[in-house]
A protein has these predicted regions:
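Glycine-rich beta-strand-to-loop/alpha-helix junction loops that act as flexible
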Residues: 29-31
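Short, conserved active-site loops that position catalytic residues or coordinate cofactors/metal ions
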Residues: 41-43
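Short hydrophobic/aromatic beta-strand micro-patches
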Residues: 46-48
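Catalytic core of pol beta-like nucleotidyltransferases
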Residues: 1-25, 34-39, 50-110
Length: 110
């Protein structure tokens, strides 16, 4: 459960992920990003980062850094190569998130 106006919590979660994993991007998606969240809505985050872990392990790795929490968190983690490949295919989760999500963090490119 997450209160829709809890910007401070969202910023804290984003900072924690950035400090620990140094992702390329973090995007909020789902009902929270669309402004349709209610008291039962969870927090859906897309994370683009370099990793050698398999997809299920990526989710556990990110989710576990928050331990027990009073809010629900769902994450999807893709590598930059996966994002490049999947963004070109209409209807994939990546293409939908990029079109409809709210960017919370994007690493500056030099």
């Amino acid at each position: 459960m997450l209160h829709m106006n809890n910007t401070e919590l969202l910023e804290q979660i984003t900072r924690t992920i950035v400090d620990r994993f140094h992702p390329r991007r973090i995007i909020l998606f789902g009902s929270q990003a669309r402004g349709e969240a209610n008291s039962e809505s969870d927090l859906d985050l897309f994370i683009e980062m370099e990793t050698q872990a398999r997809p299920p392990e990526r989710v556990v790795e990110v989710s576990s850094i928050f331990g027990l929490r009073p809010w629900s968190l769902d994450v999807v983690v893709f590598t930059p190569d996966e994002v490049q490949r999947l963004r070109r295919i209409n209807g994939t989760l990546v293409s939908v998130i990029e079109a409809e999500g709210k960017v919370l963090y994007e690493r500056p490119s030099f």
